[in-house]
Swiss-Prot record:
Lineage: Viruses, Riboviria, Orthornavirae, Negarnaviricota, Haploviricotina
Gene name in the database record: P/V/C
Annotated spans, Disordered: 1-23, 38-318
Modified residues annotated as Phosphoserine in this record: S68, S125, S192, S249, S257, S260
Keyword annotations of the record: Phosphoprotein
Other notes: The P/V/C gene has two overlapping open reading frames. One encodes the P/V/W proteins and the other the C/Y proteins.
Organism: Sendai virus (strain Z)
Biased composition (Basic and acidic residues): 7-20, 83-101, 150-168
Superkingdom, taxonomy of origin: Viruses
Biased composition (Polar residues): 50-59, 191-206
Name of the featured protein: Protein W
């Protein structure tokens, strides 16, 4: 008996739960139809239509359901819960792009702050069109405490007082060449490269370095005398026959313009030719013509110094 009563009780509970499930499904379908049929609105527009009650066809007894045990509990449809869930989803979708945009703006600001100090001079100013201040200081403060060079301080001082340069020139003071280095002093060996060296500029004050002084006429003359080119031996001298000691060249006559006697062939450049620094060069001797005998081979007594074919023939004839 107890088992049969328990089975009947379960069947009655299933029958009571079935109308409620169909009721919630019909509410969802009606809500979707209303959303699809309505016109799209902006994110920030009026969303009061979401709070309106959706009238869906309901059967008798669907709004109020009484239990079989006689309890007076009333169950309302779940349309309000569905509206609240849809509103939360819509608000979540709208808040997500806004949060992403806000995060992107923060990232851009952080990147600009991170790279702003390193690209201070290279960054493009935003107000260049209207001629406003670019934000770059002409004389930035020495924040890190590094010592500045003297040339930089002097350049800044000369830029602040442009009349000082003209006063120095009017007084005849030497004008310092910006960014230049002093020329090395070569000492006494300045003219060692045959006058092509440049004289280093010397200053009147020992504590001033890197100063070029306008030369005076006396200084220019001294430099020219010092760097005067020395005579070189590279030029060639005219070729002149060397004179042999103990001999005298015959006078010129009308038979031979070279100074040789009529019976002697014209003299060639057989002598040693000496120039200033060139070594002695001997020109190759010219052979006499066939059938003639050179003067040096015929001594005064008529005998040949070097016995040849003629001496042998005389001996055979004798």
């Amino acid at each position: 008996m107890d088992q049969d009563a328990f089975i009947l009780k379960e069947d009655s509970e299933v029958e009571r739960e079935a109308p409620g499930g169909r009721e919630s499904l019909s509410d969802v379908i009606g809500f979707l139809d209303a959303v699809l049929s309505s016109e799209p609105t902006d994110i920030g527009g009026d969303r009061s239509w979401l709070h309106n009650t959706i009238n869906t066809p309901q059967g008798p007894g669907s709004a109020h359901r009484a239990k079989s045990e006689g309890e007076g509990e009333v169950s309302t449809p779940s349309t309000q819960d569905n509206r609240s869930g849809e509103e939360s989803r819509v608000s979540g979708r709208t808040s997500k792009p806004e949060a992403e945009a806000h995060a992107g703006n923060l990232d851009k600001q952080n990147i600009h702050r991170a790279f702003g100090g390193r690209t201070g001079t290279n960054s493009v100013s935003q107000d260049l069109g209207d001629g406003g201040d670019s934000g770059i200081l002409e004389n930035p403060p020495n924040e890190r405490g590094y010592p500045r060079s003297g040339i930089e301080d002097e350049n800044r001082e000369m830029a602040a007082h442009p009349d000082k340069r003209g006063e120095d020139q009017a007084e005849g003071l030497p004008e310092e060449v910006r960014g230049s280095t002093s020329l090395p002093d070569e000492g006494e060996g300045g003219a060692s490269n045959n006058g092509r060296s440049m004289e280093p500029g010397s200053s009147h004050s020992a504590r001033v370095t890197g100063v070029l002084v306008i030369p005076s006429p006396e200084l220019e003359e001294a430099v020219l005398r010092r760097n005067k080119r020395r005579p070189t031996n590279s030029g060639s001298k005219p070729l002149t026959p060397a004179t042999v000691p103990g001999t005298r060249s015959p006078p010129l006559n009308r038979y031979n313009s070279t100074g040789s006697p009529p019976g002697k062939p014209p003299s060639t450049q057989d002598e040693h030719i000496n120039s200033g620094d060139t070594p002695a060069v001997r020109v190759k001797d010219r052979k006499p013509p066939i059938g003639t005998r050179s003067v040096s081979d015929c001594p005064a007594n008529g005998r040949s110094i070097h016995p040849g074919l003629e001496t042998d023939s005389t001996k055979k004839g004798a």
